[in-house]
């Protein structure tokens, strides 16, 4: 009985030991497989993240353009419009910087082959930055003209309009000044000047980012012009037509 009991006690211990040994050997293999799968998915996830950033930046550029068109509209409150422009402009600059950082990290070597999607994102980001700086310049011009109009309407030497409101309990009239305050006009002009300076600062930052984007662009994109990048009229076809045209002129002149 004692030997049988000892055998019953020893067998589960051996089986448990063998089970633990098998499980320890299987865990590193599972970790290696999981690590290889994650490493394979990381570039694709980064590419999708860059694509989302460029698309969001494109949306911000479109929203900013719509606000620039509304500058000077009498039906739009100018302070609230300028506040919304500042908000979208700041958010757009942050998105552009973030998109450039992510795109530069996955572009790879300059002289090697790059993914076509990366080339498309580079071109799209470059076009968005060019349009963004152009719209900033437009907003500066429109805000400058708006500031000039406000200075022209500043009531510094204008006549003061006074209403006489007699009070029922007194015969002395109450003077009520209904003219606009020069301080308010000066405050508005100062706010517009501040918005112009902030827009100019952001425009310089985006121009520097555009120059940096062109410098860090992969070599296959640097060696091509805009027409070849957008698959427009091929250069050899245009050159061949010019040769035929010149030959025809020489034939007529002779």
Curated annotation (Swiss-Prot):
Lipid attachment residues per UniProt (S-palmitoyl cysteine): 249-250
Residue ranges, compositional bias (Basic and acidic residues): 27-36
GO CC list: cytoplasm; neuron projection; nucleus; plasma membrane; postsynapse
Positions of region (Disordered): 1-38
GO biological-process terms attached to the record: G protein-coupled receptor signaling pathway; negative regulation of signal transduction
UniProt KW keywords: Cell membrane, Cytoplasm, Lipoprotein, Membrane, Nucleus, Palmitate, Signal transduction inhibitor
Record note on modification: Palmitoylated. Undergoes rapid palmitoylation turnover. Palmitoylation regulates the cell membrane and nuclear shuttling and the regulation of GPCR signaling. Upon depalmitoylation, it is targeted from the plasma membrane into the nucleus. GPCR signaling inhibits depalmitoylation and promotes localization to the plasma membrane.
Localization terms from the record: Nucleus; Cytoplasm; Cell membrane
Membrane topology field: Lipid-anchor
InterPro entries in UniProt: RGS7BP/RGS9BP
Its job: Regulator of G protein-coupled receptor (GPCR) signaling. Regulatory subunit of the R7-Gbeta5 complexes that acts by controlling the subcellular location of the R7-Gbeta5 complexes. When palmitoylated, it targets the R7-Gbeta5 complexes to the plasma membrane, leading to inhibit G protein alpha subunits. When it is unpalmitoylated, the R7-Gbeta5 complexes undergo a nuclear/cytoplasmic shuttling. May also act by controlling the proteolytic stability of R7 proteins, probably by protecting them from degradation.
Family of this protein: Belongs to the RGS7BP/RGS9BP family.
Assembly and oligomerization: Interacts with 'R7' family proteins RGS6, RGS7, RGS9 and RGS11. Component of some R7-Gbeta5 complex composed of some R7 protein (RGS6, RGS7, RGS9 or RGS11), Gbeta5 (GNB5) and RGS7BP.
Protein name: Regulator of G-protein signaling 7-binding protein
Native organism: Xenopus laevis (African clawed frog)
Native organism taxonomy: Eukaryota, Metazoa, Chordata, Craniata, Vertebrata
Gene of this entry: rgs7bp
